[in-house]
């Protein structure tokens, strides 16, 4: 099947391949699940980085694979090239000719109601907005998609942009949702999404939460384009009214959304908040991600766990009060380390207990001597 990762069987059997720590990054995990799970087990993958939220990682990967370490990651981070492009192309608001822009494309019905939001927000916005003072450039056709530098120029020319959470609301772990959907459409080729959803898809809806912040949010923040988004969690990164103007999914607050957008002071504050927190902070840069990634490997490599942990503590605890972001990540990492499936936990419980005591002792020492 397309998008399937395959490795030469002989290569996977090599001794060094089996003994070397292996890391896999996954996105678009809502289909081809069985192939992915088999790949992890057959290839002896040790680390899985996934867009599945932390609370569901064990349900999907912990119970179905032998991977030792499971981590949530984003679909993308802030590249230096994005910042450079934004700095070169960004326009003052009064020089942008498009008030609100958007691009999307239809997704298969079997991806669920969440996936249909990507076109629905644009379709309903066009239908419901009756404001002659707004210049809209909202299109949902495959032929209307924009790529590369042209996409950056488009964002730079928009004062605002619509958006929804990335991901889907149906996580088709065994492929049955797709199969039933396709079978129904074969018999009813003109069926609407609502008809197909009611007939076969409803039981699969929202069983696994698989929604995430889109890289488009970072792009809009970098170009200082105001985001008008459907309400959502956005990985806890975006806050409504602070980083974006929240639009209810039934459009019941559309008038208030437009009022806020037309309020230059409020709109500019939202834009600046998004830029400072998502871009200028560096918190979501690839550089920061790689630093955290390296920390993870150092802490969890099989050789000399204790020595590496002590070294990390010496380096990080001294900066305890200066790098609050590191504390947040460190605690999150420790929580991830103690969340393998219970059947694999027994052999490690004494070690984790000792590590926890060591950490608490060092934190207590630093707090007392600060």
Would you name each region that the model predicts?
Residues 14-21, 125-136, 220-224:
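A structural motif corresponding to the C-terminal end of an alpha-helix
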Residues 24, 153-315:
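Catalytic binding pocket for nucleotide-activated donors in carbohydrate/polymer assembly enzymes
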Residues 1-66, 81-87:
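Extended catalytic core of nucleotide-activated donor transferases of GT-like folds
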Residues 9-15, 36-40, 122-126, 151-152, ...:
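Short amphipathic alpha-helical segments and helix-helix/interface helices
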Residues 69-72, 79-207, 214, 264:
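Conserved catalytic-core segment of nucleotide-activated headgroup transferases in glycan assembly
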Residues 6-7, 28-32, 143-147, 209-213:
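Short, glycine/acidic-rich beta->alpha junctions
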Residues 306-370:
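Membrane-proximal basic amphipathic "stem/tether" segments
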Residues 2, 31-35, 55-60, 82, ...:
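Short catalytic/ligand-binding loop motif for oxyanion handling, primarily in non-cytosolic enzymes
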């Amino acid at each position: 099947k397309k998008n399937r990762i395959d490795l030469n069987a002989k290569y996977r059997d090599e001794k060094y391949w089996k003994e070397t720590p292996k890391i896999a990054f996954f996105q678009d995990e809502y289909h081809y699940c069985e192939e992915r799970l088999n790949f992890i087990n057959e290839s002896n993958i040790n680390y899985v980085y996934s867009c599945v939220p932390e609370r569901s990682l064990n349900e999907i990967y912990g119970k179905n694979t032998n991977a030792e370490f499971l981590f949530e990651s984003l679909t993308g981070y802030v590249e230096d090239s994005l910042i450079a492009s934004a700095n070169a192309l960004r326009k003052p608001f009064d020089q942008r000719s498009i008030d609100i822009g958007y691009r999307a494309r239809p997704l298969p019905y079997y991806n669920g109601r969440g996936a249909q939001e990507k076109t629905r927000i644009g379709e309903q916005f066009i239908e419901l907005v009756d404001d002659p003072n707004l210049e809209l450039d909202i299109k949902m056709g495959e032929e209307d998609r924009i790529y590369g530098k042209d996409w950056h120029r488009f964002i730079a020319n928009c004062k605002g942009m619509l958006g929804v959470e990335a991901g889907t609301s149906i996580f088709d772990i065994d492929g049955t949702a797709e199969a039933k959907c396709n079978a129904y459409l074969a018999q009813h080729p003109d069926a609407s999404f609502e008809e197909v959803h009611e007939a076969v898809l409803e039981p699969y809806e929202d069983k696994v939460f698989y929604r995430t912040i889109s890289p488009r949010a970072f792009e809009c923040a970098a170009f200082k384009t105001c985001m008008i988004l459907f309400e959502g969690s956005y990985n806890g990164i975006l806050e409504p009214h602070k980083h974006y103007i929240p639009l209810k999914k039934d459009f019941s607050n559309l008038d208030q959304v437009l009022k806020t957008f037309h309020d230059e002071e409020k709109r500019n504050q939202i834009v600046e908040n998004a830029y400072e927190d998502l871009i200028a902070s560096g918190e979501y840069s690839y550089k920061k991600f790689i630093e955290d990634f390296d920390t993870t490997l150092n802490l969890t490599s099989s050789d000399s766990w204790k020595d590496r942990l002590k070294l990390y503590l010496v380096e990080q605890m001294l900066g305890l009060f200066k790098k609050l972001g590191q504390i947040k990540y460190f605690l999150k990492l420790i929580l991830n380390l103690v969340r393998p499936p219970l059947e694999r936990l027994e052999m490690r419980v004494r070690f984790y207990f000792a590590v926890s005591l060591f950490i608490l002792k060092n934190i207590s020492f630093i707090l007392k001597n600060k």
